[in-house]
Amino acid sequence: MMTLYPVVVQERTTGEVLMLAYANEEALELTKKTGYAHFFSRERQKIWKKGETSGNTMRVVEIRRDCDDDAYLYIVDFPEDKVACHTGNRSCFFKVEHRFEETGSPTFWLELYRLVRKRKEEMPEGSYTVKLFKEGKGKIAKKFGEEAVEVITGYLQNDRENLVWEIADMMYHLTVLMADAGVTVQDVMRELEKRRK
């Protein structure tokens, strides 16, 4: 009988969990050989390469086994403009079943970036973000600069509560600036990763 291993797929730079699929030994070997994510379809009873038909391929940079050697983690490079889920969502894990409390998720900046980018694409009425985009680069740069100065002021005044507030404002305006310039969170995370020593 063929052994199937659950495989969790995680984006390298953001840590975002993209999907869960299954792999047999052959799919694992194909992944190692080609550098692209391969799985075994339980429904079709055959090997498949992720993105073979959709173009949303996943370049695997690392494969990890769990402590019991019965599950795997594919760490992948997966550009921001690609989707992992057949529904058209970036991640297959988009349905919130239950939230115990706000957790300050490490992927929140990514979620914020996507929301800001969506505002830029759809331009809904009454949105402050849309107002910034309509006013252009000069206004976006000015607002980011103002918020950066307020962060410095909060820091120098040793006012932690105000500093957190101002950093949040600055991060929001930085995210607007990035979306307007076409710079993604992944771009920034990759650059930071290069600098890690």
Curated annotation (Swiss-Prot):
Catalytic function, reaction form: 1-(5-phospho-beta-D-ribosyl)-ATP + H2O = 1-(5-phospho-beta-D-ribosyl)-5'-AMP + diphosphate + H(+); 1-(5-phospho-beta-D-ribosyl)-5'-AMP + H2O = 1-(5-phospho-beta-D-ribosyl)-5-[(5-phospho-beta-D-ribosylamino)methylideneamino]imidazole-4-carboxamide
GO cellular component, one term: cytoplasm
Main location: cytoplasm
Subcellular location: Cytoplasm
Keyword Cytoplasm annotated: yes
Region (Phosphoribosyl-ATP pyrophosphohydrolase), start-end ranges: 109-197
InterPro entries in UniProt: His_synth_HisIE (IPR023019), HisE (IPR008179), PRib-ATP_PPHydrolase-like (IPR021130), PRib_AMP_CycHydrolase_dom (IPR002496), PRib_AMP_CycHydrolase_sf (IPR038019)
GO molecular function: ATP binding; phosphoribosyl-AMP cyclohydrolase activity; phosphoribosyl-ATP diphosphatase activity
UniProt keyword terms in alphabetical order: Amino-acid biosynthesis, ATP-binding, Cytoplasm, Histidine biosynthesis, Hydrolase, Multifunctional enzyme, Nucleotide-binding
Region: Phosphoribosyl-AMP cyclohydrolase, residue numbers: 1-108
Single GO BP term: L-histidine biosynthetic process
UniProt entry tagged with the keyword NADP: no
EC annotation from Swiss-Prot or TrEMBL: 3.5.4.19, 3.6.1.31
Pathway, per record: Amino-acid biosynthesis; L-histidine biosynthesis; L-histidine from 5-phospho-alpha-D-ribose 1-diphosphate: step 2/9; Amino-acid biosynthesis; L-histidine biosynthesis; L-histidine from 5-phospho-alpha-D-ribose 1-diphosphate: step 3/9
Pfam families reported in the protein's UniProt record: PRA-CH, PRA-PH
Family note: In the N-terminal section; belongs to the PRA-CH family. In the C-terminal section; belongs to the PRA-PH family.
Descriptive protein name: Histidine biosynthesis bifunctional protein HisIE
Species this chain originates from: Thermotoga maritima (strain ATCC 43589 / DSM 3109 / JCM 10099 / NBRC 100826 / MSB8)
